[in-house]
């Protein structure tokens, strides 16, 4: 089944395609259909933002749509950056956002650096069917980046049970967490 990913993010396309192609889904960025739908993420939850994106792209395309909203929630920062993860501290690059996060956590000891990655996926079909799923992965924030893979906050998000950051995981290892 062909599905449009409501995103311009190539990293998301690669990760989601690796998982969903096994289930018979053929995922493509909206740009591959000549679309560039700019959605103001005005929601206060990952669910709201995911739905906003899915509805806008489905309205523009008339095709089944997959949208996600995801982010990092750090307990010592009362859940920040949360839904603002991609624009945390008004920084434009992953490295700048990581530096800003680490600066905000500089006085927080290791045992209080608990966090979780949250991902909400919304699937909409033109016939009105809707599926919304939420996943959470607990971990800790390191004092410095480690690893070269992934994107976003992956280099500082540490999984104690695997003794690796997301950025140190092979794509297959990371995808296994999601399934």
In which residue ranges do the predicted regions lie?
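Anionic-ligand binding patches
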Residues: 2-4, 11-179
């Amino acid at each position: 089944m062909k599905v449009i990913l409501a995103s311009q993010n190539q990293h998301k396309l690669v990760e989601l395609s690796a998982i969903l192609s096994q289930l018979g889904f053929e995922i493509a960025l909206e740009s591959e259909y000549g679309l560039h739908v700019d959605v103001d993420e005005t929601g206060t939850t990952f669910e709201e933002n995911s739905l906003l994106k899915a509805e806008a792209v489905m309205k523009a395309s008339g095709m089944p749509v997959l949208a996600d909203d995801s982010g990092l929630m750090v307990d010592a920062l009362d859940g920040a950056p949360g839904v603002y993860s991609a624009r945390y501290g008004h920084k434009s690059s992953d490295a700048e956002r990581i530096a800003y996060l680490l600066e905000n956590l500089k006085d927080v000891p290791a045992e209080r650096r608990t966090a979780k990655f949250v991902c909400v996926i919304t699937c909409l079909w033109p016939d009105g069917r809707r599926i919304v799923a939420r996943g959470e992965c607990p971990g800790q924030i390191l004092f410095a980046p480690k690893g070269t893979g992934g994107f976003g906050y992956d280099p500082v998000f540490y999984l104690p049970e695997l003794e690796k950051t997301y950025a140190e995981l092979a794509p297959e290892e990371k995808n296994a967490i999601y399934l």
